[in-house]
Amino acid sequence: MSDPITYNPGAVADFATDVASRAGQLQSIFDDTSNRTHALQEFFAGHGASGFFEAQAQMLSGLQGLIDTIRQHGQTTSHVLDSAISTDQHIAGLF
């Protein structure tokens, strides 16, 4: 094999941790926005309010989807790193 796969486990682990942190930050934004939206319900009524709250619910649903995707990306990166390290250790034992 002329082009072996190389990786820096420390950098990959840092990346996975950073991605998880970003998902946590987005979750905080989601929670704050959701709480503030719900707090408006007692002060905002009528046809305009219904449209507003439906739009907010749709936006929050999209944001939650993004958070879930980013969180999954961080977890997947971490699992792949663990598997790569395990494979490297196993192969080293074969020689």
UniProtKB/Swiss-Prot annotation:
Annotated gene: esxC
The protein, known as: ESAT-6-like protein EsxC
Major site of localization recorded for this protein: secreted
Family designation: Belongs to the WXG100 family. ESAT-6 subfamily.
Superkingdom of the organism of origin: Bacteria
GO cellular component terms attached to this protein's record: extracellular region
Entry annotated with the keyword Coiled coil: no
A UniProt-annotated Pfam family: WXG100
Location within or outside the cell: Secreted
Alphabetical UniProt keywords: Secreted
Cross-referenced InterPro entries: ESAT-6-like_sf, T7SS_ESAT-6-like
